[in-house]
Amino acid sequence: MLDIKRIRNNPEEIVEALKKRRGEYPIQKLLATDEKRREVIQKVESMKAEQNKLSKQVPQMKKNGEDTTELFKNLKKLSDDIKNLDDDLKDIDDEIREYLMEIPNTPNKDVPVGLDDTENLEMRKWGEPRKFDFDIKAHWDLGVDLDILDFERATKISKSRFSVFKGKGARLERALMNFMVDLHTDKQGYTEMNTPVLMSPSAMMGTGQIPKFKEDMFYCEKDDMYLAPTAEVPVTNLLGGEILEQGSLPIYYTAFTQCFRREAGSAGRDTRGLIRNHQFEKVEMVKFVEPSTSYDELEKLTNNAEEILQLLEIPYRVVRLCSGDLGFSSAMTYDIEVWMPSYNRYVEISSCSNFEDFQARRANIRYRDENNKPQYVHTLNGSGLAIGRCFAAVIENYQQADGSIKIPEVLQKYTGFDIID
C-alpha cells in the first residue's frame, strides 16, 4: 500500500499519478478520514493533558482536607471520554487501512501512459521466428496427436481448462521445471524454496491479491484459505513482519509451485490448450532489495528470465507495460512474450515487476539501514517461467514436418531423449 504520509503531503501528485491508471480511487475519502483521525488524536491529547492536570491536584486537595468528589467525577468522565475516543480511533484506523488497500501503486515516471496492452512499449527482441515449409499445428493438436497431452480426460476428472501431461509430455514438463530451477540456483544466485500453496487471507493481502482480486481466487471457505495464484504470494510473505539485519540484502528466492486461478474475467480468451488454465505450474523469482538498487535489480531479474528462452533458442520480445495494463501492486513491469507459431504472434510467458515498497508496507517487511533504522524493503518478482506456456512454445517451435518434436539441446540431459514421435 502507499504511504499515508506521502498521500497527505502530496495529494495532487498522487491523484495525477493514479489518473494514468484510468481508475477511480478513494483518495478524497481517505484524506477526509485521515483529517478526522488527526482531529480525534488532538482531542484525546488535550483530554489527557487535562486529566494529568486534574490528577496532580488530588494529593494537595486531600492534604488540605478539601472535598474531591467533583474532581473525581470529572476525572471519571475524562477517562470514559478518552476510552470512547480511543475506540473511535480504532474504527477510523480500520477505515483508513481499507481505503489504502483499495488504492494501487503509483506508476514509475518511465512507465508509458496508455489504456491497454496495445499501448505497451516494445523494448527489444531476441531471435527470429522460424519459417516453416509445412503446415504447422497448434500445441493442443500436437500434444493430442503425439499422446503427450490429454485434455479430454482432464475435463472428465475436473472441468474445462485443465490439462493432463502424459508419458514423454510429463517428462518434458518436469525437465523444464528442473532446468529453470537449476539455472536460477546454480548460475543466477537464487535460493530454492518449497512452500505451501494454501494461503491465509493476510498473506494474500500482503502481496495485493485481495481484496481487489478476490473473485479471481480459489477460496476454501471452511478453512478460510486461498489456493495460491502464484508463488509470489508464499515466497514474498515468508519475510512478512520481519526486520532484516543490516547487510542481509539483497535476498533472492526461487520456487516451483502449482498455481490456481479462476480466470473469472477471461471467458472466451485462449481457452484451448495450455495458455490460460485454472491450474498450472510456474517457477517464480522473488527479490528483497534496498530501495536504491531496485530498478537495477529489475533489469537483472528480467535478464534472468530471458536467459531461459535464449538457452532454449526460442524467439521472444520484451515490452514495458503501459499504465493501463500495469498490475495493481506494480510500479513498473516488463512482460516477456514468447513467439507462438500457431498464434502468429508473441504471447506473454513472464511478468517481471518492481513493487517498490508497496508490498513491503502491506506485509510489513523491513530492513535496518546503515543507521540501524528500520526501513521498508523493495520487493520484486518475475516468472522464470510459466511452465505450461513454455511447454507449448517448445513443442510448437520445435515441431517437424513428420509431426514429431525435437527436444532443445539444453533439455536433453533432463529428458533422456532428443525427440518425441
Curated annotation (Swiss-Prot):
Enzymatic reactions: tRNA(Ser) + L-serine + ATP = L-seryl-tRNA(Ser) + AMP + diphosphate + H(+); tRNA(Sec) + L-serine + ATP = L-seryl-tRNA(Sec) + AMP + diphosphate + H(+)
Name the family: Belongs to the class-II aminoacyl-tRNA synthetase family. Type-1 seryl-tRNA synthetase subfamily.
Main location (coarse class): cytoplasm
Entries under NCBIfam families matching the protein: serS
Q: Does the keyword Magnesium apply?
A: no
Output the Gene Ontology terms for molecular function: ATP binding; catalytic activity, acting on a protein; serine-tRNA ligase activity; transferase activity
Supply the source organism for this entry.
Answer: Finegoldia magna (strain ATCC 29328 / DSM 20472 / WAL 2508)
Q: Which gene encodes it?
A: serS
The pathway to which it is assigned is: Aminoacyl-tRNA biosynthesis; selenocysteinyl-tRNA(Sec) biosynthesis; L-seryl-tRNA(Sec) from L-serine and tRNA(Sec): step 1/1
> Protein name, please?
Serine--tRNA ligase
Location of the protein in the cell: Cytoplasm
Q: Which Pfam families match?
A: Seryl_tRNA_N, tRNA-synt_2b
Q: Which UniProt keywords apply?
A: Aminoacyl-tRNA synthetase, ATP-binding, Cytoplasm, Ligase, Nucleotide-binding, Protein biosynthesis
